[in-house]
């Protein structure tokens, strides 16, 4: 039997259908409130609003659970590779061996970008942020694929593959241009993560030998950042897509949203915070500053809009961070890691943070890993965008298959 919630306005009662979730909280359908009750609901920041139906990602923030298509994020990070997870998000199931091989071949086939795109990079000044370059380059792909300006259902999967394939190439090109080095073409004999590292760090006169520990760590980071429900950038992609905008334009809006320091830029801010703290001896002083409402200092990398428990992605990255630094001989003498570990230990025992459920999030350790790999801080958000592209494309594809989809129009 159908269940209803009752809303009483000015003495009149309105019945609102309660929709049963397959997992997690049920929702109240308020879509008819404005038409029937002559008023609107008000929810700043969409704190209590579900904007769509989705079967891609599930989060239980109280229990610290994150699942993609029913698979636990820790299992995916430990047992899968990034393109397996990409296939899972886009198609709904993990691939068979044959499906995986075909998928990886298709991604490799589309990894090149049009040579004319190289000229776009030359229009930027040498000090341009890689995210600014990437944002423009991804949007410009619309000019190279005019046949996709009005996507049909048959094009959705090919579009997703093209985007997944070209994003790391554009990301590496953005980095190379920002440091004045020539672009490095993709090498289709390498897997996805190896190829990105190759394009980042090889030069025409020096080959780059991929360290398997580094590759595996980056693979985990990509998986952990692949999708995360209807966050700011994903919602931006969906809103842009709801108007019928082409997929390249939609992804560029996601990149723009991700660039914000409260979203994708947080791991860079964590590095700056750890540098500011400077040493373990200063941690108590900065803990006190974080508690002081009148002090502008804030502990970055703690707390999350959804998680009221330990972020499961942070748990994986903490161990991955130790593996990378051990491989690079930095485990015992990396000052940022030592500060981070001690800061976490102190915060997790402090009643102030416990009461407010402020636990380390995914940004707390990822920046330390990137820095140890030799990836500069201005590239941190670029790498986030590479990973999140598969989530954006899966959400974009799902949105176009939703019979209830309408153009987004908040009041």
UniProtKB/Swiss-Prot annotation:
It catalyses: oxaloacetate + acetyl-CoA + H2O = citrate + CoA + H(+). GO terms for cellular component: cytoplasm. GO terms for molecular function: citrate (Si)-synthase activity. The active site is at 304, 363. Pathway: Carbohydrate metabolism; tricarboxylic acid cycle; isocitrate from oxaloacetate: step 1/2. One of its GO terms (biological process) is tricarboxylic acid cycle. Keywords: Transferase, Tricarboxylic acid cycle. Its EC number is 2.3.3.16. Belongs to the citrate synthase family. Citrate synthase is found in nearly all cells capable of oxidative metabolism. This is Citrate synthase. It comes from Rickettsia helvetica.
């Amino acid at each position: 039997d159908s269940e209803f919630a009752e809303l009483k306005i000015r003495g009149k009662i309105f019945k609102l259908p309660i929709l049963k979730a397959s997992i997690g909280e049920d929702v109240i359908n308020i879509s008819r409130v404005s038409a029937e009750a002559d008023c609107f609901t008000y929810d700043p920041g969409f704190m209590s609003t579900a904007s769509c139906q989705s079967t891609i990602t599930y989060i239980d923030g109280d229990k610290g659970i994150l699942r993609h298509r029913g698979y636990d994020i820790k299992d995916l990070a430990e047992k899968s590779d990034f393109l397996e997870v990409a296939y899972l998000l886009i198609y709904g199931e993990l691939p068979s061996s044959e499906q995986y091989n075909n998928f990886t071949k298709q991604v490799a086939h589309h990894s090149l970008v049009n040579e004319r795109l190289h000229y776009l990079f030359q229009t930027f000044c040498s000090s341009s942020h890689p995210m600014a370059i990437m944002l423009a380059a991804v949007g410009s792909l619309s000019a190279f694929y005019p046949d996709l300006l009005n996507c049909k259902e048959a094009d959705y999967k090919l579009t997703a593959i093209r985007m997944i394939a070209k994003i790391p190439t554009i990301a590496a090109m953005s980095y190379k241009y920002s440091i004045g080095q020539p672009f490095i073409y993709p090498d289709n004999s390498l897997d996805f993560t190896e190829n990105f590292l190759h394009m980042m760090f090889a030069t025409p006169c020096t080959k780059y030998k991929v360290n398997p520990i580094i590759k595996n760590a980056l693979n985990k980071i990509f998986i952990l950042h692949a999708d995360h429900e209807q966050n700011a950038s994903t919602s931006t992609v969906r809103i842009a897509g709801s108007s019928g905008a082409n997929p390249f334009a939609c992804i560029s809006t996601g990149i723009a949203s991700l660039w914000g320091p409260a979203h994708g830029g947080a791991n860079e801010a964590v590095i700056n915070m750890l540098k500011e703290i400077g040493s373990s001896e200063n941690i108590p002083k900065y803990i006190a500053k974080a508690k002081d409402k009148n002090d502008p200092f804030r502990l970055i990398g703690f707390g999350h809009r959804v998680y009221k428990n330990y972020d499961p992605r942070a748990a994986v990255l903490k161990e991955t961070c130790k593996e990378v630094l051990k491989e690079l001989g930095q485990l015992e003498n990396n000052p940022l890691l030592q500060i981070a570990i001690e800061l976490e230990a102190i915060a997790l025992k402090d009643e102030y943070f416990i009461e407010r459920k402020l636990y380390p999030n995914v940004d707390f350790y990822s920046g330390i890993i990137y820095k140890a790999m030799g990836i500069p801080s201005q590239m941190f958000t670029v790498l986030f965008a590479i990973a999140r592209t598969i989530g954006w494309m899966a959400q974009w594809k799902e949105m176009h298959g939703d019979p209830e989809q309408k153009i987004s129009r908040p009041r």
